[in-house]
């Protein structure tokens, strides 16, 4: 009996996760999204149904997967100091991979802008493109996103200091600013005089700003989950890795937007 008890005791600080179907199912839903997106760009009938089904399926998988992670961390106590250290390295590598992704699209933008092709009239922006003034909606969105970065840092410091109410308020403020940013970005797309298919400028502009907008939406969802967990007393002054990861991700979104504003809206309008 004693040998069984000793065998069951965990004598290492690492968390050996149980077999999970969520990685495989999530990759399958990502395949559905990719298929729906390709069919949509080729104007196939019913492609939007496939695309939105894949998005809904992926959101559902994210919900149940994060639910399992929260259970392992908050209720089972599996996220030791060593596990949290590994997760911090993981989110750093994830953000680094996101930086590489954005570099690829910015590379395409600078390649076309610094060496304009004959098809664009050897000028940049191409003739006929009525680009946005950087000091209208783009500048307003810059202020909004910087304020949201300050608000999420305020919330993080409040958690560390034990000021729970202030942490909840500042996190709600962050989410509100993120939603306002998204609304302004959608409005900017609606009034744009060019589209995704309008040459190199249209494709690079909408791909970069759209990719950033997608990350803003993901980050907003991330912060909303953190707000729910904060209300449910899941975070303490010492143990709040989930919130730290969301904060790092949101600051990454801020930095990308600053570079995007300077390179595409300001420098790209000359």
Curated annotation (Swiss-Prot):
The keyword tRNA processing does not apply. It holds the Pfam family COX3. SUPFAM superfamilies: Cytochrome c oxidase subunit III-like. The chain crosses the membrane at residues 21-41, 46-66, 90-110, 131-151, 167-187, 205-225, 248-268. GO terms for biological process: mitochondrial electron transport, cytochrome c to oxygen. One of its GO terms (molecular function) is cytochrome-c oxidase activity. Keywords: Membrane, Mitochondrion, Mitochondrion inner membrane, Translocase, Transmembrane, Transmembrane helix. It is found in: Mitochondrion inner membrane. Its main location: mitochondrion. The keyword Mitochondrion applies. It is an enzyme of class 7 (translocase). It catalyses: 4 Fe(II)-[cytochrome c] + O2 + 8 H(+)(in) = 4 Fe(III)-[cytochrome c] + 2 H2O + 4 H(+)(out). It is a multi-pass membrane protein. GO terms for cellular component: mitochondrial inner membrane. InterPro entries: Cyt_c/ubiquinol_Oxase_su3 (IPR024791), Cyt_c_oxase_su3_dom (IPR033945), Cyt_c_oxidase-like_su3 (IPR000298), Cyt_c_oxidase_su3-like_sf (IPR035973), Cyt_c_oxidase_su3_a-hlx (IPR013833). Its EC number is 7.1.1.9. Component of the cytochrome c oxidase (complex IV, CIV), a multisubunit enzyme composed of a catalytic core of 3 subunits and several supernumerary subunits. The complex exists as a monomer or a dimer and forms supercomplexes (SCs) in the inner mitochondrial membrane with ubiquinol-cytochrome c oxidoreductase (cytochrome b-c1 complex, complex III, CIII). Belongs to the cytochrome c oxidase subunit 3 family. Component of the cytochrome c oxidase, the last enzyme in the mitochondrial electron transport chain which drives oxidative phosphorylation. The respiratory chain contains 3 multisubunit complexes succinate dehydrogenase (complex II, CII), ubiquinol-cytochrome c oxidoreductase (cytochrome b-c1 complex, complex III, CIII) and cytochrome c oxidase (complex IV, CIV), that cooperate to transfer electrons derived from NADH and succinate to molecular oxygen, creating an electrochemical gradient over the inner membrane that drives transmembrane transport and the ATP synthase. This is Cytochrome c oxidase subunit 3. It comes from Cyanidium caldarium. The lineage of its organism: Eukaryota, Rhodophyta, Bangiophyceae, Cyanidiales, Cyanidiaceae. The gene is COX3.
